[in-house]
Amino acid sequence: MILMFDMPTDTAEERKAYRKFRKFLLSEGFIMHQFSVYSKLLLNNSANTAMIARLKENNPKKGNITLLTVTEKQFARMIYLNGERDTSIANSDSRLVFLGEAFPDET
């Protein structure tokens, strides 16, 4: 899922709403690609539907929020015209991720 948003930040109340929404996105596991462009890997349509429901519950009163659902394969084919691809584990579509130190070679 790719989420793009544009929210006003003119008043203290609007800035507070912006910070609250951004914190919500991060707490839900979204990764920031650019300012106001976030993504989250959702493994199936049920997870996608549930995430949309949570986003609707935490929808700020002002601004524009756009969602785009793409497959893992489509996301992996994203073209970077400038800058580098984020290769962190958090941005991986791998089903199995090993965390911690590498095991020594037992040969």
UniProtKB/Swiss-Prot annotation:
InterPro entries: CRISPR_associated_Cas2, Virulence_VapD/CRISPR_Cas2. Coiled coil: none annotated. CDD domains: Cas2_I_II_III. GO terms for biological process: defense response to virus; maintenance of CRISPR repeat elements. Keywords: Antiviral defense, Endonuclease, Hydrolase, Magnesium, Metal-binding, Nuclease. One of its GO terms (molecular function) is RNA endonuclease activity. SUPFAM superfamilies: TTP0101/SSO1404-like. Pfam families: CRISPR_Cas2. Mg(2+) binds at D6. Its EC number is 3.1.-.-. Its cofactor is Mg(2+). CRISPR (clustered regularly interspaced short palindromic repeat), is an adaptive immune system that provides protection against mobile genetic elements (viruses, transposable elements and conjugative plasmids). CRISPR clusters contain sequences complementary to antecedent mobile elements and target invading nucleic acids. CRISPR clusters are transcribed and processed into CRISPR RNA (crRNA). Functions as a ssRNA-specific endoribonuclease. Involved in the integration of spacer DNA into the CRISPR cassette. Homodimer, forms a heterotetramer with a Cas1 homodimer. Belongs to the CRISPR-associated endoribonuclease Cas2 protein family. HAMAP family: Cas2. This is CRISPR-associated endoribonuclease Cas2.
